[in-house]
Amino acid sequence: MSPLSEVEQDLRVIRQWQPRARRVYLTGANPFVMSYDKLMDIALLLRKYLPHMESFGMFARVTDIAPKSVEELKNLRHMKLDNLNIGMETAHDPTLERMNKGYHAADILEQLSKLDAAGIRYNVVYLNGLGGKGMGEASAVASAEVLNQLHPWIINIVSLTVFPEAPLYQEVLNGTYEEEPEVERLLEMRTFISRLAIKTNILANHVSNPVPLTGALPNDQAVILRELDRAIEHLPESELRGYRVRVRGL
């Protein structure tokens, strides 16, 4: 992580060009891994150099929340932290273990509940297809069950795309991991969205999704499901797979 002096130097430059900035996003992997004290130091600098700032956010892992108490999270919220993007990926324990994520469904529920208690708005990422062939239904059901006990502002749905430089690619080649077929992924997404019973927003328009979808739940739930039903019925596996192999970067 950058030393505090470097952060302050960057903020001096930002103040020159955007003195009335209202939204700030801390970049570089998952900055929320920083300690509470360092995050508070940065928040104080943000307030000093960007007095018009209304909120700041960053990427986070589920495990980044664990060392921080609800009281500390409330203090960060008071300093205008209000947008965490959390790479949940799934709440299906066998898949989390298979991918060495370092947490389980119970951890997701415990840690994100702390954000709810602190009043911090957050988004989660659901990685469609992560479990591989035959695991989509279980992943969708388990993930919806956990999220129905939480209050994510946005659920970003992206689809696993394995590139040659990824370690998982070697597992695909040697047969120890089999990618979920494309139609099965659409069925997984349908199950996931159909089981969500909370007020939230769905963003499934990432380049990794051959069938882009967006909407607000519960109002748009039926419309989204109809779109998925049409895609499942009319789009052949070969066409969907062709889209996947043409994706060169995320």
Predicted regions and their residues:
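Canonical Radical SAM [4Fe-4S] cluster-binding loop centered on the CxxxCxxC motif
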Residues: 1-9
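Catalytic cores of alpha/beta
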Residues: 68-73, 131-149
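Conserved SAM/AdoMet-binding glycine-rich loop
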Residues: 16-117
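Aromatic/hydrophobic pocket-lining residues that form the small-molecule binding cavity
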Residues: 7, 39, 69, 108-109, ...
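Auxiliary Fe-S-binding modules of radical SAM enzymes
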Residues: 148-250
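Hydrophobic anchor at the start of a short beta-strand
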Residues: 56, 122, 200
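Conserved strand-turn element in the central/C-terminal portion of the radical SAM core barrel
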Residues: 63, 91-95, 115-139, 158-164, ...
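Conserved, mostly hydrophobic/aromatic
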Residues: 26, 58, 86, 124, ...
